[in-house]
Amino acid sequence: MRIEVLRIGQRAVRDDRVTTHAALVARAFGAERIFMEEVNPQVRDTLADVSSTWGGGFEVELIDSWRALLRSKKGSASIVHLTMYGETIDAAIGSLRRKEKILAVVGAGKVPRDVYELADYNVSIGGQPHSEISALAVFLDRLQEGRQLSKGYGDARRKVLPMRRGKHVLEGEPE
């Protein structure tokens, strides 16, 4: 399954950090790419550094128009808008696991009505207000049934050695 993420909107300066965290979650939880508009280019640089160190081919693509992206993906990917409205994740997840390509859409603020209409699925993550970061993490984990948590990258220069107590990071050249 190929998973991509679109983050719509950016609010003031505080959102550079939130945007970075949304992208880090997308990467760590198995997405291959995140699309963003109106974002500080340093966010892309941060993610490139993370991928260089921890491995993987995660891409950050800066776009001019989220509407144009959604229209271009219509028919080639299942567009899944993560929201507090819509059908529950429990009701939708079974059919979504059978899809070949998913574009998960998360919003930074009030999401324009177009998103609800362009989405193939409006999926409720809990029916309560919370962050787009938590919605994305829950969705990607449920979609992949936790398999992404044990995924490794052969090109990683650092790897965490799981331990019950303490911490240990293996450093070296990629395999």
Curated annotation (Swiss-Prot):
Specifically catalyzes the AdoMet-dependent 2'-O-ribose methylation of cytidine at position 56 in tRNAs. GO terms for biological process: tRNA nucleoside ribose methylation. Its main location: cytoplasm. Its EC number is 2.1.1.206. It is found in: Cytoplasm. Keywords: Cytoplasm, Methyltransferase, S-adenosyl-L-methionine, Transferase, tRNA processing. One of its GO terms (cellular component) is cytoplasm. Signal peptide: none annotated. Belongs to the aTrm56 family. S-adenosyl-L-methionine binds at L82. This is tRNA (cytidine(56)-2'-O)-methyltransferase. GO terms for molecular function: tRNA (cytidine(56)-2'-O)-methyltransferase activity. HAMAP family: tRNA_methyltr_aTrm56. Homodimer. PANTHER family: TRNA (CYTIDINE(56)-2'-O)-METHYLTRANSFERASE. The keyword Mitochondrion does not apply. It comes from Cenarchaeum symbiosum (strain A). It comes from the Archaea. The keyword tRNA processing applies.
